[in-house]
């Protein structure tokens, strides 16, 4: 019956698509691209809704293009533009309380320990800084006809180009806009199919404007970040005075027509076309230094593109951007669905109508966001990747490292975007410096530590409150990304460069771990399990701090073996590796409680607020100290916990997909994917107090933005849960995990193929050990698989219960079928 219902729904969707294509609508007469595999398109502008805009970026900058006809807005961000200024968050008196807190925890006096942490073991201040909106480019167009026809707006994810077109009377107007990584500029061309019909006024604005200069064909906005007292959030530290300087610099290059500079704008009239070239820079040099000159930076960039026309700039951009995006292609579902506007398909998907082809787009959108927000030399992707319009973004749009930052980079290696991983590693170098001081100041330990959040200023001290921030494992988790990058690329020089960071994190843990008194296990002496509380006996008060958590055990079982193996590869630190190996014998085991679930803490306490975080599952995913076949009982305990679970945010749902993929359950994957997109009523934001404001220069009080804190995606495919990008990245990683796994020492093909994806193909996924994999399946079964070896390592292939070992020379490929 379910299959019949599915077929009926699919038939209705196809019928709707056919009727839509035959009907007269605002896009009639438009010529669509031949291939729309990576194209999102719409027949109306975005209006004022942030998640309706189309996102572009080059790592350094981000832009949200709304596509309005009369008054266009492109919201701008710059990766280093944050609130505040360089700051040391460490409390010099913290270590005086370390032993006292440890003794309280070891004596099961958890409430007293938590109070002491909150009062004496936190950062100064107890909150960090926030990512900030840079400003807006505003374009006021001269429109001659009240009735605009044939409106069309698209984002081509393969090229990173947004196109907008419409008919104004008898003239077709077209805009193209992209952000170029090679040239560090945003480029926009406005053109008409008849001469002399382009007239537009260009303005810049920002919350932090100090000066606007319009001269010749140049428009410059100079600004300085300053504290705005009308806006408050207890999750973002107040900083009196000013912070970094910045500049937005733009030039206008018209073809024919007239160009006039007013006091604060550029006006182009009666041109055939006009090309706008824009860049931005801040005074940020590094986390310790904001003495740079943004004007000099902008002048250098603009000088390098001077004389280059739109065609040349676009060509260079396409070579760079498409090289990354075209590496992977996922084809599932009916391509005829592409004849429907993306927003209509999103609405149907939220209502439960199947659309696998749209799921393929959402998979690619996660890759697109990573390419657009994380490039060599830029800051890493933060909670909102690169796109923020609020002065008080949710959770400061920081780097939350108890899951969110890591999830941002889960798809980097497996979906063939290793280069986009690099900004995270560069930040780790900074954090190992600031974290060394925190390790010494708070724990009198060597190595380095990072707790659950950091910001541009590389704060590493505990922040927010004990139940959130008393978790010294953030740096250790991030070190997993170093090892993963090595496993996928085989880059020994990279490993040699970053091994000291892994070692430093392990050294910190070795220095602080102690034997708890009840079981004599070696543990991190006090920590929370992120966002999960417990009840002791019949005590009605929820506790968070404990002497050992399963997540901490999982991270240690991840980091220590990686350090040992890395030391062998680079021929270093054999003695240190031996100490780690001895410590591994003394840490707590994974435990299954009386309810059959994987325990979260050292004791089998009653679970309190489940929160969002699936922390106890770390060893299963993204770690691999627990695997389905090596640890079947523990895997079963994880499955038992997942089965009744209803994820509370989109990013937790994305983690669910990854866990079910590791459980190789394609039936459940279908359900979890469907849940990912269902809209649900927003939950009250208990503590954010964030004001929403889209207009620079005006105040905003506390409010709950439309669509915040709910499941699903916006019309532009971005996660609509708190505007965070992590769920998009996590969804992409989860889909890749369904189709290919390589964490258990073998390449597993189609381990968790969603049952509704009967036919399809994936091209270009990467596997650990240095392999590139293409897979085709028919009727839910493997048809062909091509495995190319990059490094020449031995290759163990699994399909279901069939296993075979191949020796493939570097640069060579093998082709196998379901019989392998």
Go through the PLM ranges and name each one.
Residues 28-467, 473, 478, 482-486, ...:
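Aromatic-residue-lined binding/catalytic grooves and analogous aromatic/hydrophobic interfacial grooves
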């Amino acid at each position: 019956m379910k299959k019949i219902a599915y077929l009926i729904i699919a038939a209705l969707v196809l019928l709707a698509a056919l009727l839509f294509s035959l009907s007269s609508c605002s896009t009639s007469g438009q010529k669509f691209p031949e291939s729309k595999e990576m194209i999102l398109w719409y027949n109306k502008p975005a209006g004022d809704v942030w998640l309706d805009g189309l996102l572009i970026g080059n790592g350094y900058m981000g832009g949200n293009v709304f596509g309005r006809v009369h008054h266009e807005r492109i919201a701008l961000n710059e990766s280093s533009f944050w609130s505040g200024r360089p700051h040391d968050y460490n409390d010099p008196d913290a270590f005086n309380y370390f032993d006292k807190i440890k003794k309280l925890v070891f004596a099961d006096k958890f409430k007293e320990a938590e109070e002491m942490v909150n009062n004496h073991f936190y950062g100064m201040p107890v909150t960090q800084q926030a990512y900030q909106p840079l400003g807006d480019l505003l374009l006021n167009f001269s429109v001659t006809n009240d009735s605009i026809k044939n409106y069309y707006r698209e984002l081509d994810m393969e090229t990173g180009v947004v196109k907008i077109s419409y008919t104004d009377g008898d003239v077709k107007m077209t805009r193209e806009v992209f952000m170029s990584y090679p040239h560090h500029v945003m480029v926009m061309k406005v053109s008409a199919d008849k001469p002399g019909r382009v007239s537009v006024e260009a303005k810049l604005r920002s919350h932090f404007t100090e000066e606007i200069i319009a001269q010749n064909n140049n428009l410059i906005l100079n600004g300085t970040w300053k504290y705005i007292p009308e806006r408050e959030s207890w999750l973002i530290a107040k900083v009196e005075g000013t912070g970094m300087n910045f500049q937005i610099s733009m030039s206008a290059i018209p073809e024919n027509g007239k160009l006039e500079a007013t006091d604060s704008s550029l006006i182009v009239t009666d041109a055939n076309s006009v090309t706008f070239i824009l860049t931005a820079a801040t005074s940020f040099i590094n986390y310790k230094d904001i003495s740079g000159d943004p004007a000099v930076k902008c002048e250098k960039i603009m000088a390098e593109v001077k004389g280059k026309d739109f065609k040349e700039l676009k060509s260079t951009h396409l070579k760079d951007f498409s090289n990354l995006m075209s590496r992977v292609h996922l084809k599932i579902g009916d391509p005829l669905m592409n004849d429907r506007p993306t927003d209509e398909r999103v609405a149907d998907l939220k209502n439960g109508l199947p659309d696998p082809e749209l799921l393929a787009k959402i998979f690619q959108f996660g890759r697109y966001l990573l390419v657009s927000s994380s490039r060599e030399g830029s800051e890493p992707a933060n909670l909102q990747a690169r796109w923020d319009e609020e002065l008080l973004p949710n959770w400061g749009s920081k780097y939350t490292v108890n899951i969110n930052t890591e999830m941002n980079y889960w798809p980097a290696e497996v979906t063939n975007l290793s280069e986009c991983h690099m900004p995270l590693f560069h930040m780790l170098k900074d954090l190992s410096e600031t974290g060394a001081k925190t390790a010494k100041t708070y724990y009198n330990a060597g190595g380095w530590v990072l707790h659950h959040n950091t910001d541009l200023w590389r704060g590493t001290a505990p922040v927010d409150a004990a139940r959130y921030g008393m978790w010294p494992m953030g740096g250790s988790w991030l070190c997993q990304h170093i090892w993963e990058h090595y496993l996928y690329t085989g880059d020994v020089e990279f490993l040699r460069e970053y091994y000291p960071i892994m070692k430093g994190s392990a050294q910190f843990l070795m220095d602080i771990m102690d034997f708890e008194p009840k079981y004599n296990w070696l543990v991190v002496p006090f920590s929370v399990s992120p966002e999960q509380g417990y009840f002791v006996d019949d005590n009605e008060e929820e506790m968070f701090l404990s002497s050992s958590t399963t997540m901490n055990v999982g991270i240690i079982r991840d980091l220590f073996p990686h350090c040992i193996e890395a030391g062998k590869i680079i021929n270093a630190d054999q003695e240190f590796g031996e100490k780690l190996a001895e410590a591994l014998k003394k840490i707590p085991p994974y435990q299954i409680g009386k309810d059959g679930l994987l325990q979260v803490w050292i004791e089998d306490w009653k679970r309190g607020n489940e929160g969002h975080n699936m922390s106890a599952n770390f060893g299963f995913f993204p770690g691999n100290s627990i695997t389905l076949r090596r640890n079947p009982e523990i895997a079963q305990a994880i499955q038992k916990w997942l089965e009744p679970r209803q994820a509370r945010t989109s990013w937790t749902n994305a983690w669910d997909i990854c866990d079910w993929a590791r459980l190789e359950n394609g039936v459940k994957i279908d359900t979890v994917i469907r849940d990912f997109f269902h809209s649900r009523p927003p939950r009250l934001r208990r503590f954010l107090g964030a004001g929403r404001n889209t207009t620079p220069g005006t105040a905003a009080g506390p409010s709950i933005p439309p669509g915040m804190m709910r499941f699903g995606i916006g019309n532009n495919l971005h996660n609509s849960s708190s505007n965070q990008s992590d769920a998009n990245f996590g969804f992409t990683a989860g889909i890749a995990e369904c189709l290919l796994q390589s964490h258990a020492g073998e390449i597993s093909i189609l381990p968790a193929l969603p049952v509704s994806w009967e036919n399809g193909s994936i091209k270009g996924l990467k596997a650990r050990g240095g392999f590139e994999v293409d897979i085709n399946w028919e009727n839910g079964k493997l048809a062909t698989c091509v495995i190319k070896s990059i490094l020449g390592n031995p290759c163990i292939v699994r399909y279901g219960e069939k296993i075979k070992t191949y020796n493939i020379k570097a640069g060579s490929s093998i082709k196998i079928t379901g019989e392998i």
